[in-house]
UniProtKB/Swiss-Prot annotation:
InterPro entries: Ribosomal_bL19, Ribosomal_bL19_CS, Ribosomal_bL19_sf, Translation_prot_SH3-like_sf. It comes from the Bacteria. It comes from Rhizorhabdus wittichii (strain DSM 6014 / CCUG 31198 / JCM 15750 / NBRC 105917 / EY 4224 / RW1). One of its GO terms (biological process) is translation. SUPFAM superfamilies: Translation proteins SH3-like domain. Keywords: Ribonucleoprotein, Ribosomal protein. NCBIfam families: rplS_bact. This is Large ribosomal subunit protein bL19. GO terms for cellular component: cytosolic large ribosomal subunit. Belongs to the bacterial ribosomal protein bL19 family.
Length: 129
């Protein structure tokens, strides 16, 4: 591991101590709390939509969230380790078979829906106990 990778790993570890990043994948519906500066005051704005892409590049990791706002598709790329991202909450898990869901850009209505993923792991653990 070279020096840059080592520094990057230390920064990621320091960031994870202060904030927790949930395990999410493309297809999941996320609610991202973003710090917005308006004049002198800052507030947290919720941005809720479907994660359509995730790029894991160390400190440069990012994810793209797409939502429909007033009938218009809006996409926003968030840096995963940004101080402006206050919180990430997984609202719903989705079943998809692709890593990048760019095909959703051309779809409207029912064809753009994503089925919900049901994890059977917690139920299996409950039966063993």
């Amino acid at each position: 591991m070279n020096l840059i990778q080592q520094l990057e790993a230390e920064q990621i570890a320091k960031f994870k101590e202060s904030k927790s990043i949930p395990d999410f994948r493309p297809g999941d519906t996320l609610r991202v709390g973003v710090k917005v500066v308006e004049g002198e005051r800052t507030r947290v704005q919720a941005y809720e939509g479907v994660c359509i892409a995730r790029a894991n590049k160390g400190m440069g990791s990012s994810f793209t969230v797409r939502k429909i706002s007033f009938g218009e598709g809006v996409e926003r790329v968030f840096p995963l380790y940004s101080p402006n991202v206050e919180s990430i909450e997984v609202v719903r898990k989705g079943v998809v078979r692709r890593a990048k869901l760019y095909y959703l850009r051309g779809r409207r209505g029912k064809s753009a829906r994503i089925a919900e993923r049901r994890d059977n792991k917690p139920a299996a653990e409950a039966q063993e106990a």
